[in-house]
Amino acid sequence: LTELAKVARQGLRVSLSPSAVAEMERSLAWVEQAASGSLRDEQGRPQAIYGINTGFGSLARLRIPQENLLVLQRNLIRSHAAGVGEPVPRDVARAMVLLRANALAKGASGCRPALVTRLLALLNSGCDPVVPSQGSCGSSGDLAPLAHLGLLLCHLPEDPDNETGEAWFGNERLFGREALSR
């Protein structure tokens, strides 16, 4: 907790260990294999992997065509970025980023190491996500706050500014695209 507080409140720099990168690459290989359709079920069809090539919740049995998988993931982030209210304090948002980076670095989520590297770069640069203080989805309670972080990290060049999340850079509150360009 002491180091978490130092990162969140004092800007202690953080980095990713080579062993964490190796673990993430191992699980990423499995996710990429699943997303490519090369994992097969008993009938020889691409294996359904919840949330990777299927819908979510009541749409879990709906198979998503491979050409729509990126759209599925982006729309999930957009749909869950539904928080409202004043932003949480910056140190709370920074702690959230570090805790999520730490969880992803364990290698059980199938994410790219570049995602964790980018999260740590946010922390090290002082570019802090604006995370609304109210609203969430699901029993975990962290989906909406993390979706606001996701908007900041996963927008495309053609996205309107108001769909790129928001971040603090210095004392300025900016759209995500502008904050990340600094």
Predicted feature descriptions by range:
Residues L1-R182:
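Conserved, well-structured ligand/cofactor-binding cores
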